[in-house]
């Protein structure tokens, strides 16, 4: 009574019906029925602005518009063509011109060309994080995860991993349950990190004309892979058990602090650019050497020079190379005899059931283990050598043009712009039997879900603190990526035509095994929860 008298006139009880602005917004964005559709729409808009159709083509993507400029002007006219012109004017040796222009600048330029898209994407994600929306997504995902025996704590490393997989893996330390922590370490890198964005941008841009749904689907495929893997792993003895409790405070919605947003965007973008200036430069030099040198008919040297010697490259030898590569004789190129082609061609057989069993995407995939940026850098180097110049045609008569010596006049191609990515698309279409888009999508899925770069693998080893668990994680990631890509390619061909019966049966068996693991009873977890 005495306390009540003291509080009277000082304390005013808030009415039950009064809701804050954040509460009113949360009634919609965290609604059990509307939360996921709203999240899907938000992410679609994020990727539409960063990786969709360019504003120059009637779309809304600022990132793609800037990336097109970067590829054509920065990568092509300035870095590759500019450096070549300067070096040739100085009288530099051809091999040095090739190393710097076709190797270093072509590889680094191909990667840096996608920086504008990444910066726009990081800016959008930082805005969502700073305004308080992404915290709600963690709350929503916890509600969904818990239904499948997973913890919402696993979603936090996933959010961190959108910038880089290494801090994402390290963020799993906040999970107390050892089994949940190990499972999170294994699956966090499924989410597309900054280094994987150029791969998404390449496939969405080169094969799908800047399609927004391709880029958006890559993000949700990563989330789906985490959820599906979590459910399957939770039903094994190694990971069974009740999920760790997840408690977090939801901040009130607020206007983003631009200082924080720009700082976060810059930090993520700068870490990517630094890698391009270190790891990518070194890797580009190695890839240039492997694609430039090789053994041609028993002679070792630069393959371009050796192929100009008719005494070395005879018709019989071209027939042998064509048979080895599985291509027509008129499509044989100097690079088919390079060291990289010789090594990657046998390995490419492994990826034939996935739709991209050619040595070039195989080489790009394998080098992607060093750094995921290397996938695009590798394409930039290989297709910079492989620019298909066509014979010039008289615009009035339509006749082929020749010079005074009777040699065909070839049209000039952009060395590191749209032409390279058009050649990538043409090759995917060729080696997949006319199913280039499906093969490229399968290629993208595999490279998004397979083992991460060496640096992230090192982080996994530190967090696992076990060589056995590290190899298990790498094996699971590569195996899961292979199976999903196999299913996508084989079932996709069922609808696009030209299906392979054996491949289709194998894909259906894999799909059935995944469904069985997903829906089988959760016995081990029930035992643990009762005890």
Where are these regions (language model features)?
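Switch/coupling subdomain of P-loop NTPase systems
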Residues: 1-19, 24-26
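Core alpha-helical transmembrane segments of integral membrane proteins
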Residues: 28-135
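Hydrophobic core segments of alpha-helical transmembrane domains in multi-pass membrane transport
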Residues: 38-49, 121-126, 204-206, 219-234, ...
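Extended, low-charge hydrophobic alpha-helical regions
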Residues: 56-94, 98-103, 148, 169-181, ...
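Juxtamembrane inter-helical linkers in multi-pass membrane proteins
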Residues: 73, 135-165, 239-264, 383-404, ...
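Conserved phosphate-handling catalytic cores of large alpha/beta enzymes
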Residues: 167-244, 380
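Transmembrane helix-loop junctions at the membrane interface of multipass transporters and ion channels
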Residues: 190, 194-216, 458-463, 483-501
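Membrane-interface capping segments at transmembrane-helix boundaries
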Residues: 516-530
């Amino acid at each position: 009574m005495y306390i009540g008298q003291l509080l009277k006139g000082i304390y005013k009880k808030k009415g039950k019906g009064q809701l804050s602005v954040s509460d009113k917004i949360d009634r919609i964005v965290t609604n059990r029925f509307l939360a996921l559709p709203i999240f899907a729409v938000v992410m679609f808009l994020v990727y539409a602005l960063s990786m969709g159709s360019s504003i120059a083509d009637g779309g809304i993507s600022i990132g793609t518009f800037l990336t097109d400029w970067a590829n054509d002007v920065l990568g092509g006219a300035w870095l590759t063509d500019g450096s070549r012109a300067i070096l040739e004017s100085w009288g530099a040796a051809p091999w040095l011109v090739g190393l710097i222009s076709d190797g270093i600048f072509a590889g680094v330029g191909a990667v840096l060309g996608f920086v504008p898209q990444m910066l726009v994407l990081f800016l959008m994600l930082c805005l969502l994080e700073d305004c308080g929306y992404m915290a709600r997504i963690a709350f929503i995902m916890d509600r969904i995860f818990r239904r499948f025996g997973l913890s919402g704590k696993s979603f936090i490393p996933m959010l961190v991993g959108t910038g880089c997989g290494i801090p994402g893996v390290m963020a799993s330390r906040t999970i107390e349950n050892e089994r949940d922590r190990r499972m999170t370490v294994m699956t966090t890198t499924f989410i597309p990190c900054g280094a994987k964005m150029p791969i998404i941008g390449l496939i969405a841009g080169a094969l799908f004309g800047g399609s927004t749904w391709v880029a958006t689907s890559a993000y949700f495929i990563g989330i789906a892979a985490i959820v599906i893997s979590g459910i399957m792993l939770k039903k094994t003895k190694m990971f069974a058990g009740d999920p760790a409790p997840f408690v977090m405070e939801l901040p009130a919605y607020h206007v983003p602090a631009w200082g924080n947003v720009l700082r976060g965007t810059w930090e993520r973008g700068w870490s990517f650019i630094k890698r391009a200036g270190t790891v990518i430069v070194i890797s580009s030099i190695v890839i240039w050497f492997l694609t430039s040198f090789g053994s041609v008919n028993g002679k070792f040297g630069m393959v371009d020079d050796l192929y100009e010697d008719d005494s070395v490259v005879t018709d019989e030898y071209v027939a042998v190379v064509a048979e080895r590569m599985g291509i027509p004789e008129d499509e044989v190129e100097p690079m088919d005899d390079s060291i990289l082609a010789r090594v990657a061609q046998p390995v490419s057989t492994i990826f034939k059931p996935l739709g991209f069993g050619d040595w070039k995407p195989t080489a790009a995939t394998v080098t992607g283990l060093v750094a995921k940026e290397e996938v695009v850098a590798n394409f930039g180097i290989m297709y910079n050598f492989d620019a298909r110049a066509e014979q010039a045609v008289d615009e009035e008569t339509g006749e082929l043009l020749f010079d005074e010596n009777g040699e065909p006049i070839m049209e000039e191609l952009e060395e590191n712009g749209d032409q390279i990515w058009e050649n990538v698309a043409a090759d995917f279409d060729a080696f997949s039997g006319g199913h280039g888009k499906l093969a490229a999508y399968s290629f993208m899925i595999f490279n998004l879900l397979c083992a991460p770069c060496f640096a992230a693998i090192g982080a996994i080893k530190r967090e696992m603190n076990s060589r056995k668990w590290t190899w298990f994680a790498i094996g699971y990631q590569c195996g899961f990526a292979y199976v999903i890509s196999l299913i996508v390619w084989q079932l996709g061909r069922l609808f696009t035509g030209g299906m392979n019966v054996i491949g289709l049966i194998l894909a259906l068996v894999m799909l059935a095994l995944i469904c069985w693991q997903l829906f089988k009873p959760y016995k081990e977890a029930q035992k643990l929860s009762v005890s």
